[in-house]
Amino acid sequence: MTSSTSPERADSAAPAENIHWRRNLAVCFAGSFSTIVAMTLLLPFLPLYVEELGVQGHAAIVQWSGVAYGATFFAAALVAPLWGRLGDRYGRKLMLVRASFGMAICMSLTGMVQSVWQLVLLRLLVGLAGGYASGSTILVAMQAPKARSGWALGVLSAGIMAGNLVGPLIGGALPPLIGIRATFLLAGGVIFLAFLATVFLIKEMPRPPKSATQDGKRRGGWAQIPDKRPVAAILATGMLLMFATMSIEPIITVYVGQLVEDPARVTLVSGVVMSAAALGAILSASRLGRLADRVGHWTVIVGALAVAALLLIPQAFVTAGWQLVALRFLMGLALGGLLPCVTSVIRHNVPDGVGGNVLGMSISAQYVGQVAGPLLGGFIGGHFGMPAVFLGTAVLLALGAAANGVLRARHQRRLAEA
């Protein structure tokens, strides 16, 4: 038994294994990749679109671009637990259908806005209505066999990260060819294809018996968890991971500017640095997931956090751009399987009937880290210097590894005594 598995069955009558889980995984992989590409391709030209909508002045353009981009994450963090709860009650496939259809409409309308306020409003609506990738994570986590959940979530995570990597590249190439507004319309069309694939190809397991559903209505999702301590610890770990990862993002370009002598190469090297971490994570996600299925998901979490903390220390003292690229790639390899392992630990420790609800909480916690990380990272980098961000983040990850190691050991003792 792995360290992440509860001694009790989370459900006394767990639903049978879904024979379509591999096909569902393939559709979720393709759908998550395509929707993430469509959502992130606006990054290279968002400031240009804001300027086209009438905003003038460099500071105002940067500010409105940040507001428009962050609005989606803010809204998504608010509603992720709600969609998870509704998915537990009415079906997780339905949540994917809702997300893909809503995102297709909102993304297409984004190409028709006439003011920056309309742009921000639609970006909020995308966050409220969207969540295809997070919904896919919940569906795969709940319907893949528990013994293969780490591998399946690693494959899905690789697709999501690949979408984040490819989206900005496509976004840099399309607007000069077809225009910014047409690019949004094309993105809406791509998401609509994901909607069609979801409707016709995903097969969900039957819903739980009526008595189990009624019990879920009487008791809150959190109240049904037999042992809340590992779940609470992993929720905090997911937030810590995103906080630590995103705290580096605001300073990468400025830091690279101190390492590269030619100003014309700063943007290129910064892009390579960011892509290196993503590429490493893509390559390692499914492999770390498969390893976690064998040795325990919590074990991999502790090890990956410790390795990442060690790799952050030399990043504070690099003297050339290639050194930073190499270290970020290695860090991506270490962190690639962490979020799938976080999801798997939750999956193994909550009842099937409330899994979506708790995984929705996990996604919200990660969004909080994703928003707070850049704010604190930028503040520390601006007031205490760039190396302080790397060293401070290393300390956070080391503390996270130590805390998870202690909690894992205590959890194993409780399992042995049960």
Spans of model-derived segments:
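Juxtamembrane intracellular "pre-TM" segments in multi-pass secondary transporters
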Residues: 7-22, 204-235, 418
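Short amphipathic helix-loop junctions that connect adjacent transmembrane helices
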Residues: 45-62, 251-268
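Central cavity-lining transmembrane alpha-helices of secondary-active solute carriers
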Residues: 67-83, 275-287
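Conserved MFS/SLC helix-loop-helix module at the cytosolic interface between two early adjacent transmembrane helices
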Residues: 77-114, 292-298
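Paired small-residue
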Residues: 106, 117-125, 311, 322-330
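Cytoplasmic helix-loop-helix junction between adjacent transmembrane helices
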Residues: 122-161, 344-345
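Symmetry-related core transmembrane helices of the 12-TM Major Facilitator Superfamily/SLC fold
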Residues: 182-200, 390-406
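Helix-loop junctions on the cytosolic side of multi-pass membrane transporters
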Residues: 195-212, 405-416
